[in-house]
Amino acid sequence: MAKRNRKSGWKRAGAGNTINRTFKSTLFIMLFEDKNNLLELYNAMTGKHYTDPKLLKINTLKNAIYMSMRNDLSFLIDGRLSLYEHQSTYNPNLPLRFLFYISQLYSGMTKNDNLYGTAAVKLPPPEFIIFYNGEKEMPERMVRKLSDLYTFKTEEIRLELETVMLNISGDNNAPLKRACRTLRDYAVYTDKIREYTKTMELEEAVELAIRECLSEGILKEFLEKHRAEAKEMSIFEYNQERHMMQEREAAWNEGREAGRQEGMEENLREIIRNMIQQGLSDEQIISYCNITNAELEKYKKG
C-alpha cells in the first residue's frame, strides 16, 4: 500500500521494495533506482556483463541542502563514477549542472581526506550521460561541453567537462535498447503517451498507454506494482515538460520586448553552431529552434 507523505513524496513498504520521496520524482529515476535495472543499463552502456547488483554503490545527491540541484542518478562501479540524467526537454546547460553535481559528489567522497597533505587524493574518473526522449527531433548522439557555455573561446581550455546525450525516442539507439530491456520498455511507454496525447486528454492517454503496456508485457511487473504512482508521475512529467516549453517561449518573447535581443541571438547562434558541428540537418535545427530557413541562413553567416 502506497502512502503519500506531507512533502509530496512517497513511501512504499515491503522488503527490498522501499521507495522514499521527499521530492517530486520521475518515472526514469524510479525505474533505475532499482539496482537490477541500473546494472542492466550500465552493462548495456559499457559492454560489461556484471550480474551482482551489490557491486553498485548509488550515491545520488539527496541531501536537502542540495535539493534545488538534485541529480537523477549517480553511482560507483568498476572504479568509475557514472552520472546519468534524463531529459524530455533539451537543455544546453546540463554541462554546468553536471559540474555542480560532480563537485558535490567529490566533496562528499573526500570529506575525511587531508586535502592539504602531501599525499595525492585519488578520485574515480567520471562519465556524464544524458538520456533524451523529448518531442523535439534530436540527433541519435550529441556531445555538449562546458566550454560551449563560455562567453568567448580561448586557445587553451582550462576547465572542461564533456557530456554525451543519447536520444532514446523512436528507433534511435536501437542496439542500446536491445541490450537493456528496461530502457527500451521505458522508451516505448513514453512514446505511446506522447503519441496518444495528440488525439486525447493527457490522463486518458496515460491510462491507455498503461493498459497497452500491461497487455504487451512492457514494464509489466513494474506497472503491476506501481500503477497508480506511475500514472501520477507520467501526468506530472508531461505537464512539466509542456510548462517548460511554454516558459522558454515566454522568456524568448520577454527578451525581445525588453530589448535583450542581441544577447539572446548570440546564445541561439552558439546553439545553432554546435548543432551544425554535431551533424544536425537544417530541418532539425529549424524545428528545434523554431526559426525560419531564412533566419537559419542568417545565423550561419553570422
Where are these regions (language model features)?
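Elongated, amphipathic alpha-helical interaction scaffolds
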Residues: 2-302
